[in-house]
Amino acid sequence: GVAEAEAADYVRSDYLIIFARSAGSFGRGELLNTNKRMSTISAAAFADTKPHYDILDGLRGIAALTVVWFHIFEAFATSHLDQRINHGYLAVDFFFILSGFVIGYAYDDRWKKMTVAEFLKRRLIRLHPMVVIGALIGAVMFYFQGCSVWDVTKVTVPMLLAATLMNACLIPASPGTEIRGLSEMYPLNGPSWSLFFEYAGNILYAFFIRKLSTRALSVVVFLAGCGLAAFAVWGPLGDICVGFAMTEENMVGGSLRLMFAFSAGLLLSRVFKPVHIRGAFWICSLCVVALLSVPRIGGSENLWMNGLYDTFCAVVAFPLLVFLGASGKATDKVTARVCKFLGDISYPLYMVHYPFIYLYYAWVKNGDLTFRESLPCALALFFGSVIP
């Protein structure tokens, strides 16, 4: 089919309705008015359209669903070594590759008719509403999330208001100054850190990367891939679960994750030549879930082994899955509907589920609950996040 907006954004205005309504943040009338305004902006901004990669929408949703379970299992992990859905953090690298691919596909041939300011405005309109909604939900729920891991009783209302404003404006907090005490860039809604890097990638694309020749872009991808591999294999962590804090290793690792994945997606969009593949969505979905669910490899004594696995996923497997997903088509009604549903929920699900994860985490820690004891609430959290 043909998308009503450009194929790159995957963030429709009805996201505001789906998740703001489920979170109870707005009244129905205000939500409908917001949706109409966003639709008007979208229609005016994109008179021309391109074919839409429905399967990539669906794969983004599959990865987002897996991330929710990855975060649910954080409540029972003692470290990265024993967490279930152990490699769920790699979904961010998959998102970055998808983002680079669809942005290159949608915008590379439009720069003669579009300014940098217009591009950045479009991206801001598409991405930022959910950043604000996530910050507001996080602020409203903050005082219900106190536990032994973080003490919320010492946080004053002015401190909370300041944190809300910073989160909503995507201004990162430095370690020691954020209100939860976990050194997160965005303590009210942790996953916002990836939007910080997403914005950085969009800015780099608008001012610099789009101007590179395909050969020069290939060099950038190669060098960034080497840097990412070195960080993963020989770095101090044995993984690339970084980018969420304003520390040296997080900034270096997060930047490498962005530079490789986003640039690789852009490069793939330039050289992409589809092949015929049947059942691409279902095959790729199983691969995404399987790759993200692999247990930690190598243990604490062989960190490099897990780093090697992370490198394989980020550098080899994910670009291949994006290629296969872009090559396939949702030819039957069931697949098409599933992909549309998953595409519709993917971004808002990712951006607003985590404040509820904080609440679940605190409940588990305060009650010293096992996963089996908390399973009904875990399921309620999952389906409550997914179902409009």
Where are these regions (language model features)?
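Loop-to-transmembrane-helix entry motif
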Residues: 123, 127-131, 345-352
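Short, intrinsically disordered terminal tails adjacent to the first/last structured region
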Residues: 1-47
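Alpha-helical transmembrane segments in multi-pass integral membrane proteins
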Residues: 39-55, 62-88, 104-117, 173-182, ...
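Alpha-helical transmembrane segments and their helix-entry boundary regions
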Residues: 56, 118-119, 127, 194, ...
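Membrane-interface helix-loop-helix regions
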Residues: 127-199, 227-248, 312-326
